Swiss-Prot record:
Function of the molecule: Type II interferon produced by immune cells such as T-cells and NK cells that plays crucial roles in antimicrobial, antiviral, and antitumor responses by activating effector immune cells and enhancing antigen presentation. Primarily signals through the JAK-STAT pathway after interaction with its receptor IFNGR1 to affect gene regulation. Upon IFNG binding, IFNGR1 intracellular domain opens out to allow association of downstream signaling components JAK2, JAK1 and STAT1, leading to STAT1 activation, nuclear translocation and transcription of IFNG-regulated genes.
Source organism of this protein record: Ovis aries
BP GO annotations: adaptive immune response; astrocyte activation; cell surface receptor signaling pathway via STAT; defense response to virus; extrinsic apoptotic signaling pathway; Fc-gamma receptor signaling pathway involved in phagocytosis; humoral immune response; macrophage activation involved in immune response
Pfam families, alphabetized: IFN-gamma
Protein name: Interferon gamma
UniProt-annotated location(s): Secreted
Tissue specificity note: Released primarily from activated T lymphocytes.
Length: 166
């Protein structure tokens, strides 16, 4: 577990580096603290390749990237929750979580609470499974690209209106 946590702390650096602000935020020093604590600079951490950076390379579109980033951020929140009793690194984790919260959820505490609720839902609970299946049609409908269709129709109507007035 220690090697996994070390590698994950290192990957947090990589993930936050993709946002274009690596080395600029208050989190940089705290990530360095975590890397030191977990001995994440040790060469054996690289065994088996990276966890997230190769996956992120496959997601080019901004909206698609947000999907995979949400899973990665969820992973880090779970990791930090698992390590919450470790007083040596608690401050560093709190600062990183706050910065991640600002970047990923735009500082919205409501979104953070929703995000936390989602990652806490147990998938092995029968009642939860039943509720999830019951809501599946609504979720699938929400996933469909209706909003793009509406935008396209609006754009077409706007274009037609301009052409008619010329």
């Amino acid at each position: 577990m220690k090697y996994t946590s070390s590698f994950l702390a290192l990957l947090l650096c990589v993930l936050l580096g993709f946002s274009g602000s690596y080395g600029q935020g208050p989190f940089f020093k705290e990530i360095e603290n975590l890397k030191e604590y977990f001995n994440a600079s040790n060469p054996d951490v690289a065994k088996g390749g990276p966890l997230f950076s190769e996956i992120l390379k496959n997601w080019k579109e901004e909206s698609d990237k947000k999907i995979i980033q949400s899973q990665i951020v969820s992973f880090y929140f779970k990791l930090f929750e698992n390590l919450k009793d470790n007083q040596v690194i608690q401050r560093s984790m709190d600062i990183i979580k706050q910065d991640m919260f600002q970047k990923f959820l735009n500082g919205s505490s409501e979104k953070l609470e929703d995000f936390k609720r989602l990652i806490q839902i147990p998938v092995d609970d029968l009642q939860i499974q039943r509720k999830a299946i019951n809501e599946l049609i609504k979720v699938m409908n929400d996933l469909s690209p209706k909003s793009n269709l509406r935008k396209r129709k609006r754009s077409q109507n706007l274009f037609r209106g301009r052409r008619a007035s010329m």
